């Protein structure tokens, strides 16, 4: 009686969640480790090394580093890039989908990454903009459910990517131009407001520009 639902992707430990702006001349010596890591470019461009391969990633590009793959990242010297870097443990076969692939994120996936960063600020007692930080201590009292939401958003992010690239949907041009229903737009506006509020709360001690918001 009842069903035990199957998890297609099961996450273990979270090792790092970072969002930071590199200097335009930043250079990292590289590393390898026995867990997954991905790098997503939110602004600018970077030169990423995967094993012996070099690739220039631009805004919206996403690259996965499989366990034990040597990798590093360097700014190109032109634009100071903003990056999301998340590393985590996962042993599911579904993760082989990401081997040696460079992907482009869509708006849903971009929002999921933003949600992960927001929840990380709610539960980790450290800065998220230190690329060399290896230990992420938890706050003594974090927001209820923040740790679980990180896991859920990250699972959603990975599943959404696999689904979208495995079964691409081509929408008719007419549908693409159709204005969103008012109910949908209202929900979207509320979500944007909440996200801006969260951002401002996490930057109370810094000068925030309109472009950043």
Please describe what each predicted stretch is.
Residues 171-213:
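A short, Lys/Arg-enriched amphipathic alpha-helix from helix-turn-helix/homeodomain DNA-binding modules
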Residues 1-62, 68-69, 76-77, 96-97, ...:
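Generic protein-terminus/edge-of-domain signal
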Residues 42, 87, 117, 162, ...:
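Short, locally clustered residues in the helix-turn-helix/winged-helix DNA-binding domain
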């Amino acid at each position: 009686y009842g069903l035990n639902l199957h998890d297609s992707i099961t996450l273990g430990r979270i090792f790092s969640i970072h969002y930071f702006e590199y200097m335009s001349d930043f250079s990292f010596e590289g590393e390898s480790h026995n867990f997954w890591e991905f790098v997503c470019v939110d602004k600018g461009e970077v030169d990423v090394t995967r094993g012996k391969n070099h690739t220039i990633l631009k805004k919206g590009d996403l690259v996965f580093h499989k366990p034990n793959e040597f990798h590093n990242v360097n700014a190109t010297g032109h634009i100071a890039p903003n990056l999301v870097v998340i590393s985590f443990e996962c042993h599911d076969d579904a993760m082989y989908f990401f081997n040696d692939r460079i992907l482009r994120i869509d708006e849903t996936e971009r929002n999921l990454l933003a949600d992960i960063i927001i929840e990380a600020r709610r539960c980790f007692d450290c800065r998220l903009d230190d690329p060399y930080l290896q230990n992420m201590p938890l706050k003594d009292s974090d927001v209820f459910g923040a740790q679980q939401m990180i896991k859920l958003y990250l699972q959603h992010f990975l599943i959404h990517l696999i689904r979208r690239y495995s079964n691409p949907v081509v929408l008719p041009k007419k549908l693409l131009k159709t204005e969103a229903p008012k109910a949908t737009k209202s929900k979207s506006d509320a979500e944007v407001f909440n996200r801006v509020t969260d951002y401002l709360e996490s930057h109370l001690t810094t000068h925030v520009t309109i472009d950043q918001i």
